[in-house]
């Protein structure tokens, strides 16, 4: 025990005794001496040989280590919560069907600033839906599904209030498909919102999205599932729309298995309603990891790949087939520009397409840096993309504004006369130009 104690003391002298971690580590080391546990090698190359395969020392977490002894981690973290304790309170998806916001939004129309803008945007969305010739394109950027907006979008799809979706890959794969597998996003404590504890979260394999937690180990399952889907496909170039349709088919075939259960999903709802989903930057998400692994394993052989130009051509076909269009844009980025540009793309293909008749954007981005996300819809009109008669910018955070706009149109029954456009079927046969 004395020899072990001397080794531990050498390590302790290398720590900052004034730091909280140093003090806690000292306490653990002293506890090891009392338990007659030999000192471990804390080098990066050293690994525990127990089932957890964690790195010795503080470098990798999990439950116990054969070098430090069962219970060492609980002793080390002290007041720090375990992974199970942190991933407890689930993010809840708001249900617009349960909240009639019409009186509230109507009252906001008589106010000023963003309240009035939001009320006007809600009225434009209502008009967009009552125009049964209008093809409604929903654009999604930012981390929306993890924030509790999944059910809003699912309800819009199921009630014919959205005819096509353009999104970032994260919303569709890392968040929606992830939850369709039976996993969840969790509420983070206020102390974590601004970065306190991020190092500990990394040790626990918990990823943070501002005030929301996601289990990295579960994300790896999502990555692997997309690889399984990729491996099952005929090797060729796919549009992201085609690939996501295969994901929807996979959910349809597997959703009732015990490991997946019954869960809402945008991918599944769109598959069932033939609502196409486009992710122009599709590799920038969990699907990208699956595609990379697939192509790495098949070096020198035919592989599955994603063709973003095919995406652009397909969504332009929708504009040609359905000339009257409206945009409901949450955030900006690639989805916003991609959807706006189909007017110009149709013109390049020799079709005189009208500008988007309706356009709404919810954003907190600033127009003054010249970036796309904050560029106004009036600016887009100078490019020949958006008509100015029915357009509205709403400078507000999406989790507050989007449910109000969507809920307003839903409870006004604006979708009553709409029928399924099933745009995914249109893409089976390219439109003649």
Predicted features by range, described:
Residues 122-135, 269-271, 317-324:
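Glycine-rich phosphate/diphosphate-binding loops that line cofactor/substrate pockets in enzymes
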Residues 153-221:
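A generic, well-ordered mixed alpha/beta core segment in the N-terminal half of proteins
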Residues 2-3, 15-27, 41-44, 49-53, ...:
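Short, low-complexity, charge-dense intrinsically disordered segments
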Residues 197-287:
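Ligand-binding beta-strand-loop-alpha-helix segment within the catalytic cores
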Residues 82, 86, 324, 348-433:
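C-terminal functional extensions of proteins
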